[in-house]
Amino acid sequence: MAQGCIFCDIIAGKIETEFVYEDDVVVAFADIRPIAPTHLLVVPREHHATLADTVASPGGTAVLGRLLKVAGHLGAARAEADGGYRVVINNGAAAGQTVYHLHVHVVSGRHFAWPPG
């Protein structure tokens, strides 16, 4: 757990949050500032600041695999009703990362243009 990390505080139970999914590696919960009708965050229990940090860490590949597997299951559960879903990882300030604890956004329920932005 990292000092001052909101996601670490959520995982530790210091901030009350309803998990829509949890296992021994990841948790998932609704984003407090959703950009779509469905906007979930899938977060590893272990603190990794960025995608790059996770890739470089021992066991990072397994963490990433679990994040994507859970994101895929959560997205697929809503895909039929929503017509599809988007999975996003923002890595670094220039990419829009605001919480420096790796997380995957699963968003659906509205049309998303390409390119994003």
Name each region found by the language model:
Residues 1-117:
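HIT superfamily nucleotide-processing domains
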